[in-house]
Amino acid sequence: MNMTQIHNIGTELDWVVLIIYMVAMLLFGTYFAKYNKDTNDFFFGGRRFTWWIIAMSIVATGISSHSFVKYSAMGFKYGFSSSMSYMNDWFFVPFFLFGWLPIIVYSKIRSIPEYFERRFSPSARFFVTILQLMYLIGYVGIGFLTMGKAIMPLMPEHLTVFGFQIHITLMGLIWVTAIVVGSYITFGGQTAVIFTDLVQGAMLLFAGLMVFIVGVAYVGGWHSFWNLLPASWKLPFAGFNSPAEFNSVGTFWEDAIAGSVGFLFMNMGLIMRFMATKNVHEGRKAATVNILFMLPISAIVVGGGGWVAKAISVLNPNLIPKNVNPDSIFVLVSNIITGPGVFGFVIAAIAAALMSTVSTLLNATAAIWVNDVDKPVRVWLKKIKRDDPSDEKRAMMVARVSTAAFTVLGVLAVYAFSSYPTVYQAHAFFHATLTPPLMIAIFFGAFWKKFTPAGLISTVVGGVALMLLGFRFPLELIQPIAHGTPYDPIHPFTYMAALYNLIVCTGVAVIVTLLQKQLKHIASRIKKIPNHNVIMYSMVVFIVAVFIIDILDIFFKINISPLAGLVTLTIFMTICVALVTTFYVKYDAEAQTTGLTVWSIHKAKEWFKGSKLNEREGENVKVHYKIVDGDEDVINFSQKDMHKMAAEPGDLVYITDTRKWLGGLKSCHSVFGKPHKEDGIVYFRNLHLGKGLFVEGRLLEAEKEM
């Protein structure tokens, strides 16, 4: 059935409000460039912020433009069950709070691929970098596509500006949006993202709740709203395994398992938010507040428009056509229930959602490019040594150029997703496809000490190859475990593919790791053969050939071999990957797990500090500062103040402006130096003033970090 696309709604006042908002956010984000003294500031906001700013920032990232569009669409079609995706993240949160979060902070990694190099090997970093960049670029593409679909209903076919007639197209609209978003993240960095998100997060919550509350009033109040909804719309869960486009079991595997772990553990954009908190404790508070309070509210914010639209369609069927495009439902219902200007504000909220999510992801891609591509390549080309100090000026330039480049790649990725009928299905396919191998790699790497480089690389290469076979043969490989979900020949098992992908990736990871002793034995025997390099090179050629065969078979369906033959080849190829990795990769299980798994976090804290921990409880102190000569990164306190703080020279200190509403914007980290005798005074160097941008005469608060 052809769906009706809404066009040319809204007024000139709405456009004025939208444009003013976009310009304001551009200027606001660019303003924060002054807080970027180095790449630590650009990517991680200087590790300075308190929990409430990060919690609100996470809201703006989680409630992206595709959330408004896709959950309102599902709310319109299926009711309150559209909130399932926002209520199923809780059971993985403890693993994040007490496992992954302290690991990534205390290990001082600057990207997820860097963690894999330290935990496994440089080759592991290479493969994870490829998957991570694909994940982030794809996510950016979905964001841009959604933004275009959301704003397109407002657009006429032509727009006249100063006498010139401009033809409006979806891709043209997306390119303009990309320029705006790319500009402020390119120059503002992570601090720009966090503070624009503080504004946008509040705006998103207010706009979404306003649409829901005003919509309920529009249909006659809560009693009328409740009675207008069909009984099935009031259920908290969708059908167990039907319809194919939205069901509980599919949502569980695609979103609750793959999506939740992917969002918490591997979404570098989100992780960089937590790395911008002043310490791990603040990050834990931000995550806890988000899961207990922000996500339930967010479920109403993004789904409420669809619920109201359903009630309006029952009350007055003429206002909302039966065959309306579900992706337009939030924009349409907002236009119906709000007046000129207010509707523009609501659309600006969607713009805020896109800008928040995409800017976060672009910042993350730039971080990965600088840390995991640019620097390793320069080391490989012998232009620099691995331990050389970073050229911050060059790194900042590379970060900004790469941000602009990934903005363009994100727009190009739109073409890959535009063929899907709805954003919800496109996003589900994206989650089910790119999340499982990285999810298994991260989860096993952090929580299973015995997980080896062979297990990881076999998961990434062999697991992905088996996933490709699942896409090519869904009836044979996915349907037996699809829990009875209907088969859609155009988009087969969009959700249940996540379960299949998780099974094959987990199976490869576990089996290869458990066979590590046997793999080492075989590798040692091969090393004794005179022409062992020829054997290994032949295996590498075989691995590449089989992987190419799997790709050709899925995309071109050339039927090189029947399913049984392809599965056999792929399994044998996976064994070869494990053997080649075991043969070439040097791995010290003790050294490369200490401080990098959940079982040795205390050691990671010592590494973070650089000395033994001082965990004595102390008090925070209020101080003023005095500038002294020197360029050493230490701050000197009085003996009395250090006694209050239970601090010793060499301990870590965090000092901030006492104005809580700044959320740590004017703050910095340093080290306790030798004490002096001026109580209530700290001795700063100019570098501390530059980092913290403290205001002369303002009272500061200092706390011992560890």
For the regions a protein language model found, what residue spans apply to each?
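Membrane-embedded helix-loop-helix hairpins and adjacent transmembrane boundary segments
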Residues: 1-611
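Short active-site-adjacent helix-start/loop capping segments
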Residues: 65-67, 663, 691
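Short secondary-structure transition/capping segments
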Residues: 222-223, 702-706
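Short beta-strand-centered segments at strand-helix junctions
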Residues: 611-656, 667-703
